[in-house]
Amino acid sequence: MTSVAVIVPFRVQVGQTREEELDEFLPYMKSYLQNEKNFNNITRFHIYVIKQYGTYGDDLKKFNRGLLLNIGFSLTNDLYNIFIFHDVDLLPSDSLSEYYSMYPKKPIHIAGCWQRYNGNRNYFGGIVSFDRKCFNIINGFPNDFWGWGGEDDALLNRCIGNKIKPYKIEDGGVLDIENGIGYELEEKLQVLRDNKEFKCLDKWERIEEDRLNWRENGLRQIHDRFKILSFETINDHTMIEVEIE
């Protein structure tokens, strides 16, 4: 039986439109996954939104995508056999639907076809599918990338270091709904140059450190790093708000 957990990291951030994106993402993805269920490609699915407490700009903690995704996996890993780590601002085209029900014998980079990054062979972010075994082998994501960027590079290094070669999808389409427009790469980079506080400022140093300490910094080390503040299920999605350290 094929059961799918879609795990979405989420944080309200000044100057961004994440709440509006979530309002568009949830009905789209529920319909998208329900179609797969109707065709008997999956037996059940659920979307888990792991919301980081606070609003950056009002507190000092930056967004920590990797830690949120590790938390989402840890709360769902006994319930499903496919885990899709999914950014809230990306909507897949119909041509990608088969990869949402395909058992990932090796990780599947569903967003590998995203036009913004399709010239970057090392890009491993956006939408990635894992099975339980592979995600545990690599100890999940690193927990110490605060701000935008780097945790997906470290995730790819963890796969390669464990002789796990991801399958990159190169045909298909992904719609970027960030801020209501489809940013091109240079536009996205300019936003980050203008708002350096959004970025992980020590990204490259942390990527190199992670090559050595990935066994001690990841999925197996999260249990004292978060506290659940609220848990609300509405139909096929659950919002879990967490305070993280």
Spell out what each predicted region is.
Residues A5-R18:
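A conserved hydrophobic helix/loop-capping motif in glycosyltransferases and polysaccharide synthases
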Residues Q13, E21-I42:
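Short, acidic, metal-binding catalytic loop of nucleotide-sugar glycosyltransferases
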Residues F25, D144-G147, D153-E245:
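C-terminal catalytic/acceptor-binding lobe
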Residues N38-Y80, Q115:
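Active-site-proximal specificity loops/subdomain of glycosyltransferases
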Residues L79-S93:
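Short beta-strand-to-loop acidic/aromatic patch adjacent to the donor-nucleotide binding site
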Residues D94-Y117:
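Conserved donor-nucleotide/metal-binding helix-loop-beta segment in metal-dependent transferases, i.e.
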Residues C113-F130, I137, G147:
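A recurrent flexible, glycine/aromatic-enriched loop bordering the glycosyltransferase active site
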